Amino acid sequence: MLYSLLRPLVFALEPETAHGIAFNAMETAHRLGLYRARPAPCRSRSIMGLTFPNPVGLAAGLDKNGEHIDALAALGFGFIEIGTVTPRPQPGNPKPRLFRLPQANSIINRMGFNNNGIEGLVANVKAMDYKGILGINIGKNFDTPVEKAVDDYLICLRKAYRYASYITVNISSPNTPNLRQLQQATELDSLLGTLKLNQQRLADEHGKYTPLLVKIAPDLELPEIDSIAALLMKHRVDGVIATNTTLSRAGVETLPHAREAGGLSGAPLAKRATSVVARLHHALQGALPIIGVGGIMDAAGATEKIAAGASLIQVYSGLVYRGPHLVGEIAQVLCNANGGGLDGASST
């Protein structure tokens, strides 16, 4: 109720300014103990060797540097993913680079992996009180040639490994030049081979196995999805996140800002993202879990992702448009389904 009253004021501000103000307010409320969500009664679920208290996660992109983990955790998330982080700090693309399309409950962004670098993120993670499941989403610096991208991923993998519950390899942002080339079969085969080899070395070194996931785009043809699924299984990748933002403007073509460059998230992405989840589920046959994300604006949207084959879901734009209560709303519905558990894909 409070968020619905405040939203018009927040939306009157430039989006990145509003983002900063919202986080400052959330941090203040958290420090004063003014809010703490009551998690929905839920049977915890073991996926990738991790115990998830509920299936609702925060997607990467909202807290790029891991500066607000404790405050976000108080909203009742079952897991939190921070990043995307790169080896070196970078400012991202010039502003303006974030645009709301409120008529369609959607957002266009061309942020360009603005972040303070992996060392800054790790310092924030080490300072947090949060003891829940934390994903760290890693990417390459904008000026790293795509043929050298593996070097950037390795730097981030090695520095984040000890502190992450799982690590997501972002090869699908549309806002870093040529990044999506890494979804092509030859490039992805090589990248996954190198990352999995180093994952095992790090597991031996630290006595801790940190699952490795890959985040893919929604703008893939069916044969491309099948090819990616085959490579994920070949390299025994631990999970897949579907999907990132889309370059499509279907359904929003006439709206203000629709022609802005960048990736579209929010309600118009829902059907496309769900279809990718369903195709992955068919191709993977339960071999690894899917985290469904893209256009989830309510519990019904989350249920659709689970029905399509996702084991867990993540929200971002829905949180912006619906407010913090969305987390508990979705968790309550999903946790009440099937006696507090979920069906979805493999939970191994």
Swiss-Prot record:
This is Dihydroorotate dehydrogenase (quinone). Monomer. It is a peripheral membrane protein. One of its GO terms (biological process) is 'de novo' pyrimidine nucleobase biosynthetic process. GO terms for molecular function: dihydroorotate dehydrogenase (quinone) activity. It comes from the Bacteria. Disulfide bonds: none annotated. Substrate binds at residues 64, 109-113, 170, 175, 244-245. Its main location: membrane. Its EC number is 1.3.5.2. It is found in: Cell membrane. The gene is pyrD. GO terms for cellular component: cytoplasm; plasma membrane. Belongs to the dihydroorotate dehydrogenase family. Type 2 subfamily. Binds 1 FMN per subunit. InterPro entries: Aldolase_TIM, DHO_dehydrogenase, Dihydroorotate_DH_1_2, Dihydroorotate_DH_2, Dihydroorotate_DH_cat, Dihydroorotate_DH_CS. Keywords: Cell membrane, Flavoprotein, FMN, Membrane, Oxidoreductase, Pyrimidine biosynthesis. Pathway: Pyrimidine metabolism; UMP biosynthesis via de novo pathway; orotate from (S)-dihydroorotate (quinone route): step 1/1. FMN binds at residues 60-64, 84, 137, 170, 215, 243, 266, 295, 316-317. It catalyses: (S)-dihydroorotate + a quinone = orotate + a quinol. It is an enzyme of class 1 (oxidoreductase). The keyword Phosphoprotein does not apply.
